């Protein structure tokens, strides 16, 4: 399994001959190296409905005939836009031809915000994502605060690689993310959701230096880890 980081919370996984994108916020993302028009993808996994995570999902899904796996309300909302979706919910798992997906808790919000019409559409509960393929498991925490059931995620799953938000303000900050890493007990931890906007500026290298009992790695956009 090859796992690549593409800025903010964008993660690409190549496994079982398929390409999977998590939270493909590409257009308007100053930290990504990807252009939506160049992306080939078989499946898109979404943690929640905010614009900096849904991003280019509709365009990518239609262009590539990709399935979008998302929490039920968000999947329904996207299906109304002509997207092929597979709805799930927290605690549920499903085996796809590209791998196994399980949604975990995340403490955040989830909505589609239409600035032009000043409307907010509820898109269900936010989620974290456990993805398993080729006997390896990746945990993408989505946007979340620290919560004690992260201990349970670590107890019930053998996590090989975890992506944790460290930006603070909208998610947990570096200090809480250090504790999250301890509880999740992943072999390797990569920081995400930082330095995209001024309000979430952080030093990822200081974060990885504070990690204990795991390997911390800062990935620049386009860099990857092979599991």
From Swiss-Prot:
Protein origin, superkingdom: Bacteria
GO molecular function: hydrolase activity
Annotated SUPFAM superfamilies: Metallo-hydrolase/oxidoreductase (SSF56281)
Signal peptide from the UniProt entry: none
Keyword line: Hydrolase
InterPro entries for this protein: Metallo-B-lactamas, RibonucZ/Hydroxyglut_hydro, UPF0173, UPF0173_UPF0282_UlaG_hydrolase
One Pfam match: Lactamase_B_2
Listed HAMAP family: UPF0173
Similarity remark: Belongs to the UPF0173 family.
PANTHER family assigned to the protein according to its UniProt record, in alphabetical order: UPF0173 METAL-DEPENDENT HYDROLASE MJ1163 (PTHR43546:SF3), UPF0173 METAL-DEPENDENT HYDROLASE MJ1163-RELATED (PTHR43546)
Protein name per the record: UPF0173 metal-dependent hydrolase BCG9842_B0515
Organism, scientific name: Bacillus cereus (strain G9842)
